[in-house]
C-alpha cells in the first residue's frame, strides 16, 4: 500500500533549565473555530481544502543547521566600539536610568555595538551607553568597555546556528558545582562515596557516555527550516553527535581542550556570576540534584592532582564533574514546512500502534501499520462507523481519529489572518501547531500541551485557551521540573532571579498560586513511550531525601527543606515545588502569565499532553517558531519584551 505520507522523525529525549519574565501585552480578540467541521454524514467534509498531492520525506538527517539571518548572537561590530556583558544578565532600559522601562536583556560574554561615549551617569558610575537597535545599558557591574576583561574571554554566548543553543547534560548523581578546579582531597570531602562512584564509572564509561543523534544533528536552512534528505557532511558543518568526542559533547571545542586560563593554578580569575553567591573561599557554589538539566559551554580534563577527572563548564561558569553527568542531544523530531505541494489538511499519527483501514460496505477492515508520527495528506472526507470517526487520505485509505492529530484550516479566521499577518494556531485536542501567514499555512507540527487536557486551567495543569499575543521572548532561561519560572509570572522557586529582574515583572497581579508550565513529569494518557531516562524523571527524583524529618516549625511527618546551602538540596528545591532545575530551556515565548511556547529537550512524546500548562515543542520546531515570530530578538540580545518599542507580539490562538 502506498499512502500519501510524509515520514517524520521520532526520537528520544532529555532535561533542561529556565528563568524568565513577562512584559505586559494585550490580547487581540478573535473567533476560533473547531478543528474539524461537523460530522454531517458518512462522507462529511473535513473543514478546509486539500491538494491531494503525495508528499516526499522530511527526514531527520545527522546534520547541523545553517545560521538563520538576523539571529541574536555577537553583533557585527564593523568600526564601532563594543560593550561587553560581564554579569549573567544585563538589563536593557528604554532610557538611561534604572527606573525606566525594561526592553530586554543581554547574556554574559555578549558584545554589542555601543555609542562612543556614555550619554549620562545618573545612577551608573561607569556611564549609560546606547546600544542597537534601542535602549541603554549601564557599564560597571553588568557590562564593560574593556574587551580584554577575563570574564568576556571565559564565557560563551549561545550558539544559534543549531537547534539547541548549548550542549546539554543530565545529572546522574548528586554533585557539587565547583567554582574552581578541586584537588583530589577536596573532591573526596565534597562527594559522598566518591571512590565507589569512580570505580563504577570506569567500568561503565562507554555506556554512560553514549549518545544518540539529536536535535543538533538535524539539517536546517538559513530560516531554521528542516532540510529533507540533507546530512551533516553534505552541509559541510562538521561531525554528527555520534562522531564527536566526549569533550565536544560537553561543549568543548575539541576533545582535548586544556584547563581554561581562568582556572589555572587551582585558582579562579573571574567572579562567580551564578545565582548561588559565595564569599570567595568556598570550593563549590550549590549542588545539583539527580535529573537536573545543565547547559554546558566547555570541558577539560585534569591531571592526577584532581583525580584525572574531566570537568564540564556550565553556562554560568561553574564546574561539574563529568563522571556524574550524561550528555544528551534532545529529540530530532520535527514538523513539516508547508507549500503548494504539501498543505492542509494533514493528519499526524499520534499512536505507536496505529493502522490504516479500509471501509467496505460499511464495515471497517484493518490494513497496514502506520509509522509513529508520520504525516498523511487528507482529501477532506470523513466517515463515522460504530461511533468511531475515520479520515480519508489522498490515496484512499482511512485513518482512525483515535490514532491521529489533525492540522486543518479553521472554520473562522482571526482578524490578523484577514489582514495577512503572522499568527499561530494550536489545537489542544489534536496536539498540533500551525504557523500561518494570513490564510496561508507555512509550518505544521505536533506539540505537547498541559497534562489535564481540556480541564479548567485555573485549577489544573491544562493549557489556557483563548487568544493572546507573544509578550516576551527568551533565547533560553531556567525552569524547575514543575516548569515554574521566576520570569514567567509566578514566584521563583528554584533560586536565581536575575533574568526576571532584567526582563521586568509586569504581570505580578496576574500570577496564579499554582504553577502551570511544562513539566518533566507526565501523567496524561498516552500511546507514546517516553525514552529511558525521561521515564524515570517523570516520576520525580526519589533518590534523595531530606536529612532530617523534624525541624523547628515542621508539622508531624512534614519535612522542612532548607532555603539555602543544604548539603544535599542546595537551593534546588522548595516545599511544594519542583525537585530539580532545568537550566537554559531554549526558545521561550510567553503569551500569558505562566504560559509559554518553549523547547523541551527532556522528553520525546510530542503529540501527547505532557506539560504543566506550557506548550512544549521539539527543539527543531521551537527554534523554527522562535525566529519566525515577532518581535524579533535583536542581534546580540538574549531576550526582548514585546510592545510599542520593540514591536507587537505575534497572535497566538489556542482552542480545543
Spell out what each predicted region is.
Residues 73-75, 226-302, 541-584:
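Intrinsically disordered, low-complexity acidic Ser/Thr-rich regulatory segments
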Residues 26-29:
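C-terminal motif of bacterial Sec signal peptides marking the signal peptidase cleavage site
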Residues 2-17:
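Bacterial N-terminal signal peptides that target proteins for export
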Residues 32, 37, 50, 58-83, ...:
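Boundary regions of SH3-family modules and the immediately adjacent low-complexity/disordered segments
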Residues 409-455:
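A structural motif detector for short, solvent-exposed N-terminal "entry" segments of globular domains
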Residues 94-110, 277-292, 359-372:
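SH3/SH3-like (including bacterial SH3b) beta-barrel domains
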Residues 417-419, 452, 457-465, 480-656:
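Exported/periplasmic cell-wall-interacting domains
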Residues 78-80, 87-89, 126-128, 291, ...:
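Extracytoplasmic
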